[in-house]
A protein has these predicted regions:
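Residue(s) in the substrate-gating loop at a strand-loop-helix junction
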Residues: 124
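N-terminal Rossmann NAD(P)H-binding glycine-rich loop of SDR-like oxidoreductase domains
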Residues: 11, 19
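Alpha-helical segment proximal to the catalytic Tyr-Lys
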Residues: 109, 153-154
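Active-site helix of classical SDR
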Residues: 104, 140, 148
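Short, flexible catalytic-loop segment of classical short-chain dehydrogenase/reductase
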Residues: 167-177
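Conserved NAD(P)H cofactor-binding loop of Rossmann-fold oxidoreductase domains
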Residues: 72-77
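Substrate-binding pocket helix/loop in short-chain dehydrogenase/reductase
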Residues: 79-81, 88-93, 184-188
């Protein structure tokens, strides 16, 4: 039986790479993103929407999944707390944490009924240390790591596998916009054992 996968943040970066990998391996893949479906991914079943809004269209078009990849997220331009507005804080938490919680909660119900499922949350190196982002991003990713650990514990005996991936700097269009203009990319590469990002 072909497994069904949902990838959030499917149009670019890590999410796009996940989509390509699952498609290459024969999975039925659904992607959701606020940006357009990349034109070369015609076999991707795509839902264009803002995950911080009403999620009903997503849940209606895809009532259950076997594998959930919560990959959508945003950075915060490395702002310290005194430069972070309430609006910026809330926007980052709305996508990086709250949307993931709501999507996971919905599909978790179906996974519990089937007694099977895999949830992969895209945490970050900023989930475990400071300096991987600004105050809002780092706090949101710490919270996501906590949520991931708790649901992994809560559903371990229900045949639901929960994983939190915590990559360091990955070169994507989103990170390049933050890293390259001020030479941060060079510093990241120097601080990384493989000397690249």
């Amino acid at each position: 039986m072909t497994k069904t996968v949902l990838v959030t943040g499917a149009s670019s970066g890590i999410g796009r790479a996940q989509v390509l990998t699952f498609l290459e391996n024969g999975y039925r893949v659904y992607g959701v993103d606020k940006d357009e479906n990349p034109v070369f991914l015609n076999e991707l079943r795509f839902v264009k929407m803002d995950l911080t809004g009403d999620l009903t269209p997503l849940f209606t078009s895809l009532p259950e999944v076997d594998i959930l990849c919560n990959t959508a997220g945003i950075l915060d331009d490395y702002h310290p707390l005194h430069e972070t507005s309430d609006e910026d804080w809330e926007q980052i938490f709305a996508l990086n944490l709250t949307a993931t919680m709501k999507i996971t909660r919905f599909y978790l119900q179906k996974m519990l009924e089937k007694k099977s499922g895999i949830i992969i949350n895209m945490c970050s190196i900023a989930s475990f240390l400071a300096g991987g982002g600004g105050a809002a991003y780092t706090a949101s990713k710490h919270a996501l790591a906590g949520l991931t650990k708790q649901i992994a514990l809560d559903y371990a005996d229900k045949n639901i596998q929960v994983f939190g991936l915590a990559p360091g700097a990955v070169k994507t269009a989103m990170t390049a916009a933050d890293f390259e203009p001020d030479g941060l990319a060079d510093w990241v590469a120097e601080e990384t054992p493989i000397k690249r990002w």
